[in-house]
């Protein structure tokens, strides 16, 4: 599966409450595979994934960050890796890797 195909699957199967921008980038801090930012004033979620990673790791980082994006309506949960995030991660994983 290509990275862009995974983004399209997630957009259709696990849509976010805001517009989303997904970028493969070389501009992340060292040892950071991905990040998810929320700009409420623009109603925009920006997901960045490290371009230098192998494809399978890029997909895992995308799934991880998309799960954070699913919690955009819950500010106390958005940056956590708690039970709510775990459920979102599982849903995203199943969308990208259906059994």
Language model features: what each stretch is:
Residues 60-72:
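Active-site recognition of the HExxH zinc-binding catalytic motif
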Residues 43-62, 76:
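Short pre-active-site segment immediately N-terminal to the catalytic Zn-binding motif
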Residues 17, 23-44:
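Catalytic zinc-binding patch centered on the HExxH motif and its immediate surroundings
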Residues 25, 48, 82:
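Residue-level signal for threonine
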Residues 74-99:
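Post-HExxH zinc-binding segment in Zn-dependent metallohydrolases
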Residues 27-29, 52-53, 67, 76:
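Short, solvent-exposed loop/turn segments at secondary-structure junctions
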Residues 1-19:
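Zn2+-dependent metallopeptidase catalytic core
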């Amino acid at each position: 599966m290509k990275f862009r195909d995974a983004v399209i699957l997630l957009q259709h199967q696990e849509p976010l409450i805001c517009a989303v921008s997904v970028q493969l980038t070389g501009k992340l801090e060292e040892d950071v595979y991905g990040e998810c930012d929320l700009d409420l004033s623009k109603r925009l979620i920006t997901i960045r994934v490290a371009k230098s990673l192998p494809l399978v790791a890029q997909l895992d980082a995308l799934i991880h960050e998309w799960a954070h994006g699913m919690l955009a309506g819950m500010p106390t949960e958005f940056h956590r890796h708690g039970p709510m995030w775990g459920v979102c991660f599982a849903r995203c994983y199943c969308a990208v890797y259906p059994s």
